[in-house]
Regions:
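Aromatic- and acidic-residue-enriched carbohydrate-binding clefts of CAZyme catalytic domains
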Residues: 1-11, 24
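Active-site-proximal helices and loops of the catalytic beta/alpha 8
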Residues: 22-24, 28, 38-124, 138-144, ...
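Short loop/turn motifs at secondary-structure junctions
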Residues: 30-31, 159
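Conserved short secondary-structure transition element at the edge of the structured enzyme core
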Residues: 152-170
Length: 178
């Protein structure tokens, strides 16, 4: 129900074929090396399997597939990277709701349980969604020191860290999403 994106009909084989063709076009003609797929949890897994298999079949090309989602089935479908929403939620609870910091180790272990080899989880303290709908890391994590501590934790716990626009310089204002 987003107003800025089309809701595609994944029941349509013609739409699926065109979407995969478009993805292949970008890989071949624009020489991109991967895709970040928004709201990947909401797209049927069999579509992702077909699309990623097609992209991985391009000769002499290694694609990076990044799913904005946290279903581990996305990794089985061929994505190498998913969002660590569980960890991020617990991290905010540690800073704002007095959750024991040891819970971060528990959620981290759970996140990595059963993951296929050569797959990773993205760790962050801010991204475009959080900045648009929630607040800045400085506000969420109780100041600049808290935001830096939270970021260190995202590095320490493993995964792939995300540095969002302005975070590296302590940006304290929300960036316009649109």
């Amino acid at each position: 129900n987003w107003q800025d994106v089309a809701e595609l009909n994944y029941s349509s084989s013609a739409m699926r074929k065109e979407m995969i063709s478009s993805m292949k076009y970008w890989a071949l003609e624009a020489n991109i090396d991967g895709f970040r797929c928004d709201y990947a949890d909401g797209v049927p897994m069999d579509f992702w399997e077909q699309a990623i298999d097609t992209l991985n079949a391009i000769p002499d090309r290694k694609m990076i597939m990044f799913a904005e989602g946290n279903k581990k089935e996305l990794l089985s479908a061929g994505f190498q990277l998913i969002f660590g929403w569980n960890f991020y939620s617990k991290l905010k609870e540690v800073f704002n709701n007095n959750l024991a910091a040891s819970e971060l180790q528990t959620v981290n272990a759970g996140d990595y349980t059963g993951m296929p080899s050569n797959t990773h989880i993205l760790r962050w303290i801010s991204n475009h969604d959080d900045d648009a709908w929630d607040d800045t890391p400085i506000a969420i994590f109780q100041g600049i020191d808290g935001s830096l501590a939270a970021f260190v934790l995202t590095f320490y716990m493993g995964g792939v860290p995300l540095v969002y626009n302005g975070q590296e310089v302590g940006c304290s204002i929300k960036l316009s999403f649109f």
